[in-house]
């Protein structure tokens, strides 16, 4: 039965990722080219009506193809560049090629993260098989593709302890789309455990400075207008576009009590992850950890790469689970995280593939239905609670080493 041992080794031995990953990238490049060739692009208006083409600096007066601009400054710069690179939005084909390259670069970064975390090769095919993910990138040209690249580059940098670069890249991603704020709790935990309180606060200041520097042209003109539009936290979402909460009905979806309930669940889940998983490397109870941290007695820890990736992606998925409304483009953040989280949750490979397929079906159902939205929420809950229930393995399979202070890089 040597062939059985060979198949098992190919599926479970992480050393095979080194040669499998380039083959998957090559195959996916061919698939992207085929999609661009055969499927009409759906993002012509997005390229042809870019708001910054008029050089307007008052954020309250800038409009895009779908109405008032509601994204931060880096989004404006990114799509201004795209607007000019595509001959003022007329060369849609070249725009698709650019987003296909963006997709493939992000895939390479994701594969690097998977390899460094020791993930088994049987997860890798799931990283290139998503119909919805290809649509988000090469057919819809959403800014979420740019933000997702920033997210994964930041995760890779955090895994390799490049703290300053990681925070700068992450904050730039936040300036493309606020979804990346969902990583903030994880970043706080990882940096505090690795560097202690003072350096972590310094990195937080750096993140704010990146936002200020990117927004200077708009802050000089109308700072209140920029902050209210770019970082609007009270935005009312339209029920007809929701992917996740359609099954609760429009009245509940639009109610303030539902929004507050989701916020409360989000806070409780973050606390549960912190107590049962994220902070256990501190080797003390939560009250003792806080006391030691404030008193300057916290002993820094060299965190293993699988732990860092698990903390980052679990923070992301908890945030998506408790989001007021998810739209189809949000799959850019979730799709590549799901296989890893299901693996860390300890699911059998067959069950893992089944959950992935159900999630993929739900996100490809347009418009969303009660059933598809239930599956979206259940799949997110399965990933979040699965990792939480399996926290002993999900966060502690690798030993950490006490160390002195780690320097910013």
UniProtKB/Swiss-Prot annotation:
Subcellular location: Endoplasmic reticulum membrane
GO molecular function per UniProt: dol-P-Man:Man(5)GlcNAc(2)-PP-Dol alpha-1,3-mannosyltransferase activity
InterPro entries reported for this sequence: Glycosyltransferase_ALG3
A GO biological-process term: protein N-linked glycosylation
Gene Ontology terms: cellular component: endoplasmic reticulum membrane
Transmembrane helix in keyword set: yes
Pathway noted in the entry: Protein modification; protein glycosylation
Topology in the lipid bilayer: Multi-pass membrane protein
Stretches that traverse the bilayer: 19-39, 60-82, 92-112, 138-158, 168-190, 201-219, 258-278, 303-323, 336-356, 374-394
Protein's job: Dol-P-Man:Man(5)GlcNAc(2)-PP-Dol alpha-1,3-mannosyltransferase that operates in the biosynthetic pathway of dolichol-linked oligosaccharides, the glycan precursors employed in protein asparagine (N)-glycosylation. The assembly of dolichol-linked oligosaccharides begins on the cytosolic side of the endoplasmic reticulum membrane and finishes in its lumen. The sequential addition of sugars to dolichol pyrophosphate produces dolichol-linked oligosaccharides containing fourteen sugars, including two GlcNAcs, nine mannoses and three glucoses.
Protein name per Swiss-Prot or TrEMBL: Dol-P-Man:Man(5)GlcNAc(2)-PP-Dol alpha-1,3-mannosyltransferase
Taxon lineage: Eukaryota, Fungi, Dikarya, Ascomycota, Pezizomycotina
């Amino acid at each position: 039965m040597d062939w059985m041992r060979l198949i098992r080794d190919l599926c479970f031995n992480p050393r095979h990722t080194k040669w499998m990953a380039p083959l998957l990238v090559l195959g996916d490049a061919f698939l992207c080219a085929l999609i661009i060739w055969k499927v009409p692009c759906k993002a012509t208006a997005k390229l042809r009506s870019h708001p910054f083409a008029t050089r307007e600096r008052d954020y309250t007066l800038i409009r895009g193809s779908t109405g008032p601009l509601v994204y931060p400054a880096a989004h404006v710069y990114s799509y201004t560049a795209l607007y000019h690179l595509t001959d003022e939005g007329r060369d849609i084909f070249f725009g698709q090629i650019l987003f296909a390259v963006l997709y493939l670069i992000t895939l390479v970064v994701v594969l690097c993260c998977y390899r460094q975390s020791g993930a088994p090769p049987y997860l890798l095919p799931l990283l290139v098989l998503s119909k919805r993910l290809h649509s988000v990138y090469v057919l819809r040209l959403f800014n979420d593709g740019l933000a997702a690249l920033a997210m994964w580059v930041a995760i890779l940098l955090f895994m390799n302890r490049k703290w300053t670069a990681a925070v700068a890249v992450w904050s730039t991603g936040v300036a493309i789309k606020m979804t990346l704020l969902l990583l903030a709790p994880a970043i706080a935990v990882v940096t505090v455990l690795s560097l202690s309180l003072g350096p972590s606060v310094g990195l937080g200041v750096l993140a704010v400075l990146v936002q200020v520097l990117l927004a200077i042209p708009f802050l000089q003109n109308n700072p209140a207008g920029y902050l209210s539009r770019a970082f609007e936290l009270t935005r009312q979402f339209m029920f007809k576009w929701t992917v996740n909460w359609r099954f609760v009905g429009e009245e509940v979806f639009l109610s303030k009590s539902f929004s507050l309930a989701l916020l409360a669940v989000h806070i409780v889940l973050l606390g549960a992850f912190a107590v049962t998983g994220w902070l256990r490397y501190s080797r003390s109870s939560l009250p003792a950890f806080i006391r030691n941290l404030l008193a300057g007695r916290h002993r820094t820890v060299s965190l293993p790469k699988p732990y860092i990736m698990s903390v980052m992606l679990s923070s992301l998925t908890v945030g998506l689970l408790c989001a007021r409304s998810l739209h189809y483009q949000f799959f850019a953040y979730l799709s590549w995280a799901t296989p890893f989280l299901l693996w860390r949750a300890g699911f059998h490979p067959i069950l893992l593939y089944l959950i992935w397929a159900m999630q993929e079906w739900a996100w490809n159902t347009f418009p969303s239905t009660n059933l598809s939205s239930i599956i979206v929420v259940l799949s997110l809950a399965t990933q979040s609670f699965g990792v939480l229930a399996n926290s002993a393995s999900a966060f502690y399979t690798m030993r950490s080493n006490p160390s002195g202070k780690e320097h910013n890089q």
